[in-house]
Amino acid sequence: MALNLTSSRRALGSLKPLTRAAFSGVRGYATAEPDLKATLREAIPAKRELLKKVKAHSNKVLGEVKVENTLGGMRGLKAMVWEGSVLDANEGIRFHGRTIKDCQKELPKGKTGTEMLPEAMFWLLLTGQVPSVNQVRTFSRELAEKAQIPEFISKMLDNFPKDLHPMTQFAMAVSALNYESKFAKAYEQGLNKADYWEPTFDDCISLLAKLPTIAAKIYQNAYRGGGALPAEVDLEQDWSYNFAAMLGKGGKENENFQDLLRLYLALHGDHEGGNVSAHATHLVGSALSDPFLSYSAGLQGLAGPLHGLAAQEVLRWIIQMKEAIPANYTEQDVNDYLWSTLNSGRVVPGYGHAVLRKPDPRFEALMDYAAARPEIANDPVFQLVEKNSRIAPEVLKKHGKTKNPYPNVDSSSGVLFHHYGFHETLYYTATFGVSRGLGPLAQLIWDRALGLPIERPKSINLEGILKQVEGQ
């Protein structure tokens, strides 16, 4: 059972903030190796020099802007700096040059399970370095120490209507955390621009620590009748374990779910900077809004049906397919259902991607996880996902209206949560929201360290476009 932060008679969400002194002498992973903040501090001068070198080429051309870019949501425009990851249309995502398989091999794992820790991924995203096991254990403990939410946030969540959308609750709670923003207070008092990154870092770590607690409390209130969370934060455990425990999935009997959560959170943490949640966080942060307000904007973007709701839509569609086709279905039955979906004017959820033109490596990582566990591989719902992943691409190619007919990560993630008993599809995006904090918050720290300016693109009306391009 988890180690209590205070008496077990008090609910986690209603605790008053503990001082650092309360934990003096309890850090179990003290090490001579630099912690995350010290590692970042050492990396900043070199990155600032790199920025100077890039600025020396300010008059060079990066690419062209076509009408289709301006009308098509700015797709394909190289218009923002994003350090943690690069997305290639054919190779998929790379984190500081490392593939997902590289990260699974190199990044430290939890005390149980075999999957990489999301906090190790955050370390990599922020510093470009692979942390040692001791460095990650120390960082995990720091996140656990800072996981409790202020009493007023807990009361606010308790007072929300139980059927208020989880993402609305999530965004409001994160936004309200700016009451304790170190950056906002330091900026108001006067702060050297070169030092903006430090209170921003502190806020980002505080927010990362609290995201699982907020998300778990929303789940408890909406789907489990409210009251205290099933477990309090265990100072000796990692970020994902504590999230799982607060969702009611702690202990040795739930190790597979805890490992799935580690993989899911690490995979969904960053996917370049142009997606809505990442870009919204960067955009709002560029006005020097604190990390809490900035990421609240990212969460509200994530709540949009075109961004963060795909996993639940896939699951609903798969279950509808399962009910519509025979119990002993054939590949032709699946093929026919796919065509019926397309011919009715709907899309096949979980297929295609704004950038990728090959199968999503994140999808493949989750499928590999499932294939290695017979209890998932034999799940009829999962088997239908696997069958679709082989049949749907050929159907979509024949249909001819998609640039990428391959499955994306959403094809499998919701189904895996469903397998482990989480059937509340409306909540899936909140889990995504816990994960997505990793990349945008890491970049927000670099935005402050590099002194990147407020985002201010030029807009143009339709008549202006026509006047400019007619006669070309």
From Swiss-Prot:
Keywords: Acyltransferase, Mitochondrion, Transferase, Transit peptide. GO terms for biological process: carbohydrate metabolic process; citrate metabolic process; tricarboxylic acid cycle. Transmembrane segments: none annotated. Pathway: Organic acid metabolism; propanoate degradation. It is found in: Mitochondrion matrix. GO terms for molecular function: 2-methylcitrate synthase activity; citrate (Si)-synthase activity. Its EC number is 2.3.3.5, 2.3.3.16. It is an enzyme of class 2 (transferase). Optimum pH is 8.0-9.0. Homodimer. This is 2-methylcitrate synthase, mitochondrial. The gene is mcsA.
